[in-house]
UniProtKB/Swiss-Prot annotation:
HAMAP family: SurE. Its main location: cytoplasm. It comes from Bordetella avium (strain 197N). Its EC number is 3.1.3.5. PANTHER family: 5'-NUCLEOTIDASE SURE, 5'_3'-NUCLEOTIDASE SURE. The keyword Metal-binding applies. The lineage of its organism: Bacteria, Pseudomonadati, Pseudomonadota, Betaproteobacteria, Burkholderiales. This is 5'-nucleotidase SurE. It catalyses: a ribonucleoside 5'-phosphate + H2O = a ribonucleoside + phosphate. One of its GO terms (cellular component) is cytoplasm.
């Protein structure tokens, strides 16, 4: 079993080290992670400059680019053999609902999915790593299940783990994505030189945390396991849009 491991918090993040340690005896691991924190980088690729790859003292490879860069470079330039699985994380904070659109952790996994490789993104819901060992144990259990019974279609799974002791986790629930309220306003401040600058505000609170959502599972102390897809087509609107666009199609 060949496993590629990445993240978005950077190659020296505790979450990455914990995930690698938890999976170390499950196969041949290759670690390729960003040089610095790229939280919120989403699926961005670096196209305006070359990328460099260096090796840390612990053997981890790190790239001066985004999480997507890391997986892309690993799959197309660093690894001689295609991995059987790609895992990303463990992220320092939740990736619930709308977070998945911005998450570098999820983006690393989705890049592997684009190459037809099963991928799993892991996140510890609260920041600070208080119960990181518990999250790593839960991540291992899920990876073990994927190894023992691989999902038929290349899977893209988003996993959020409550910040609590392993013994207090209330199992795993298969969920859909919930939804957040819009983000808080930007925070405006002034630099010592008199320039006005803006910080992106905090994420919004849960707007859809009903039963069946990832938010609901986490609030109830369960690990949320959400299957994702990258096809953004709104199939339910195709027929309506065809009728709406008919005059344009005929006379543009």
């Amino acid at each position: 079993m060949r496993i590629l491991v990445s993240n978005d918090d950077g190659y020296n993040a505790p979450g990455l080290e914990a995930l690698v340690e938890a999976l170390s005896d499950l196969g041949e691991l290759t670690v390729v992670a960003p040089e610095t924190n790229h939280s919120g980088a989403s699926n961005s690729l670096t196209l305006n400059r070359p990328l460099s790859v260096r090796q840390a003292a612990n053997g981890f490879l790190y790239v001066n680019g985004t999480p997507t860069d890391c997986v892309h470079v690993a799959l197309t330039g660093l690894m001689d053999t295609r991995p059987d699985l790609v895992v990303s994380g463990i992220n320092n904070g939740a990736n619930l609902g709308d977070d998945t659109l911005y998450s570098g952790t999820v983006a690393a996994a989705s890049e592997a999915h684009l190459f037809g490789i099963p991928a799993i993104a892991f996140s510890l819901v609260d920041k600070g790593w208080e119960h990181l060992e518990s999250a790593a144990r839960a991540a291992r259990r899920i990876v073990e299940r994927q190894i023992a019974a691989p999902l038929g279609v290349p899977a893209l799974l988003n996993v959020n783990i409550p910040n609590r002791r392993y013994e207090d986790l209330r199992g795993v629930r298969v969920t859909r994505l919930g939804k957040r309220h819009p983000a808080e306003p930007v925070v405006r401040t002034t630099t010592p030189y008199g320039d006005t600058v803006y910080w992106i505000g905090p994420v919004g609170l849960a707007a859809d945390a009903t039963p069946g959502t990832d938010f609901h599972a986490i609030a109830d102390g369960a690990v949320s396991l959400t299957p994702l897809r990258l096809d953004l087509t709104q199939y339910a609107q195709l027929e309506q849009l065809g009728q709406w666009a008919d005059p344009l199609c005929a006379n543009l």
